[in-house]
Amino acid sequence: MNIHEYQGKDILRKFGVTVPKGIVAYSADEAKQAAEQLFAETGSSVVVVKAQIHAGGRGKAGGVKLAKSPEEAFEIARQMIGMTLITHQTGPEGKVVSRLLIEEGMGIEKEFYVGITLDRATSRNVLMVSTEGGMEIETVAEETPEKLLKIQIDPLFGMQGFQAREAAFFLGLEGEQFRNAVNFITALYKAYTSIDASVAEINPLVVTSEGKVIALDAKINFDDNALYRHKEYMELRDTSEEDPFEVEASKSNLNYVRLDGNVGCMVNGAGLAMGTMDIIQLAGGKPANFLDVGGTASPQTVEEGFKIILSDKNVRAILVNIFGGIVRCDRVAGGIMEAAKKMDLHLPVIVRLEGTNASIAQQMLDESGLSLIAAKGLRDAAQKVQEALA
């Protein structure tokens, strides 16, 4: 689960991570009031008006601007709220700005990058720091890897003090700035582990002219599988920032990702789903979605899966690819038949069922009287999809 910058900063503040003073605003009037309050409380000469969307690259797209007065903050907010912000992470459709973060300005002396995430190759959390603050960390890793330090964290011991100090040394900090950076990194790691985050990224981390180490921006992503342990954070979810198809799928515990093709896919198991999309592509088609109905697919989940696939008007054919291990193919076949009858399917539906009770399932489909196309293997299924689209 992704959350907004201001929400992430509110969480980090509770763990002792230093963040600027800021106030969220939902209108130009609220932005003006927030600016007046920040000017009065901080003595800053400027405030920063920041669009709140679930995407990076906001500054280059005009989503981060400075205001030297409450009136200027009002005018910027008036133009920004309701605008569609297009960045390299939003795609060409962009995201509509519905809220802003009004934040105190900072006298920036240095900019760095600090992030913590899970390294799946080593099954360990990794602390990453870079002297290239404000840059995409993927670009830094590819073009100037010598400017990026990765520190593997032993899950048995957690991050140790010497590792936080190693990171601060790498950034070239000394004296009070060094001590502040060590404390910052330690607090960030505590927050990351305590809330079961999948990503805690500060970009940029800045050192101010007063020597303070502050998170100028913050990205916090939660591990969905651990959210049941943090129900207080579930209310932070902003479904308006998510694809409506994916939101609907999550209500039925379906793992769905919308793509831009025309072949709807319904598969059980993430690995098989990715393999299915690959072979559709190899056969000349384009998958319209990733849809994993899970290892215990039932007639109900199959029916819900069809509803979600068919809600995408770009879909011109559907491929159902089920391997029956725990799940019984005859139960899935029952779900396919029920869905086909209820929804009056007019699109070609190619079905490949293998595994437990596959022969029974095949017989059920053959005798159903429905125009379902049976496939004998994955390659045959992909070929039949292409024939149906021709």
UniProtKB/Swiss-Prot annotation:
GO terms for cellular component: cytosol; succinate-CoA ligase complex. Mg(2+) binds at residues 203, 217. It holds the Pfam family Ligase_CoA. Pathway: Carbohydrate metabolism; tricarboxylic acid cycle; succinate from succinyl-CoA (ligase route): step 1/1. ATP binds at residues 50, 57-59, 103, 106, 111. GO terms for biological process: succinyl-CoA metabolic process; tricarboxylic acid cycle. Residues 9-248 form the ATP-grasp domain. Gene3D superfamilies: ATP-grasp fold, A domain, ATP-grasp fold, B domain, Succinyl-CoA synthetase domains. Substrate binds at residues 268, 325-327. It is an enzyme of class 6 (ligase). Binds 1 Mg(2+) ion per subunit. One of its GO terms (molecular function) is ATP binding. It catalyses: succinate + ATP + CoA = succinyl-CoA + ADP + phosphate; GTP + succinate + CoA = succinyl-CoA + GDP + phosphate. SUPFAM superfamilies: Glutathione synthetase ATP-binding domain-like (SSF56059), Succinyl-CoA synthetase domains (SSF52210). InterPro entries: ATP-grasp, ATP-grasp_succ-CoA_synth-type, ATP_grasp_subdomain_1, Succ-CoA_synthase_bsu_CS, SUCC_ACL_C, Succ_CoA_ligase-like_bsu, Succinyl-CoA_synth-like. NCBIfam families: PRK00696.1 (NF001913), sucCoAbeta (TIGR01016). Belongs to the succinate/malate CoA ligase beta subunit family. Succinyl-CoA synthetase functions in the citric acid cycle (TCA), coupling the hydrolysis of succinyl-CoA to the synthesis of either ATP or GTP and thus represents the only step of substrate-level phosphorylation in the TCA. The beta subunit provides nucleotide specificity of the enzyme and binds the substrate succinate, while the binding sites for coenzyme A and phosphate are found in the alpha subunit. Heterotetramer of two alpha and two beta subunits. This is Succinate--CoA ligase [ADP-forming] subunit beta. The lineage of its organism: Bacteria, Pseudomonadati, Chlorobiota, Chlorobiia, Chlorobiales. The gene is sucC.
